[in-house]
Amino acid sequence: MPRYKLTIEYDGAPFFGWQVQDTLPSVQGALEAAVKAMTGADLRVHGAGRTDAGVHARGQVAHVDIEKQFPPGRFRDGLNAHLRPHPIAVLEAEIVPDTFEARFSAVKRHYRYRIVNTRANLALDIGHAWRVPRRLDSDAMHAAARRLLGKHDFTTFRDTECQAKSPEKTLDQLDVLRDGREITIITSARSFLHSQVRSMVGSLVWVGEGRWTADDLSAALAARNRAACGIVAPPDGLYLVKVDY
């Protein structure tokens, strides 16, 4: 039974997250329906990251085992045909060893968060970025972000319903870059807690607005208390960009 690795991009706006839902649209559910249309079988598609409702992906990775072996290009094209009109694209399909696990074989996940720092309404970026009208000091945000690098207990920055066994994570990258009115926050780690990226982004926005200092961010981290977190950024601006193996 061949195992296929799929590289996928999607617009998360119409979906209630990656994970399959009984009655609500999900990315996993749409992919599994496409696989069934090709194979006639109900098969589980396993993702590298269970993105929340409204979160997008440019490089989500998944794997699926199927009985029949298709040429990878044909399998990719067939899935894309059956996925229409969902805003999901299978960019690549390849046959991998059965030891490969999309989630557990991953060594690093890369996310990007888009902020449009403008008083004007969003037009083309609605649902794909967070509009923040108050002027943000991106240099202060970047400097404060240094405080979160490395291994920490990120209890403050995880959802109260997070099911991870440990709140400790090692943050390898957290950069804040400005290009005109757009601010991009780039982060990477082996894995993240539920809502960790959005919680860090929202707290950094408080730094950018002048509500918090870098010391306030450090104090929030040290508190190990969800109540100490700043605002949680909306899902619109978050993208799973790449998964390393």
Curated annotation (Swiss-Prot):
Active-site residue list: 52
Q: Which GO terms describe its molecular function?
A: pseudouridine synthase activity; RNA binding; tRNA pseudouridine(38-40) synthase activity
Membrane spanning residue stretches:
none
Q: Which Pfam families match?
A: PseudoU_synth_1
Which InterPro entries does the UniProt entry name for this protein?
PsdUridine_synth_cat_dom_sf (IPR020103), PsdUridine_synth_TruA (IPR001406), PsdUridine_synth_TruA_a/b_dom (IPR020097), PsdUridine_synth_TruA_C (IPR020095), TruA/RsuA/RluB/E/F_N (IPR020094)
Endpoints of the signal sequence: none
Which UniProt keywords are given for this protein, alphabetically ordered?
Isomerase, tRNA processing
User: Could you say which residues bind substrate here?
Assistant: 111
| Reactions catalysed, as given in the entry | uridine(38/39/40) in tRNA = pseudouridine(38/39/40) in tRNA
Q: Which GO biological process categories is it annotated with? A: tRNA pseudouridine synthesis
Give the SUPFAM superfamilies listed for this entry: Pseudouridine synthase (SSF55120)
Q: Give its E.C. classification number.
A: 5.4.99.12
What the protein does comes down to: Formation of pseudouridine at positions 38, 39 and 40 in the anticodon stem and loop of transfer RNAs.
Q: Which protein family is named in the record?
A: Belongs to the tRNA pseudouridine synthase TruA family.
The record's subunit annotation is:
Homodimer.
The protein depicted here goes by the name tRNA pseudouridine synthase A
Organism ancestry = Bacteria, Pseudomonadati, Pseudomonadota, Alphaproteobacteria, Hyphomicrobiales
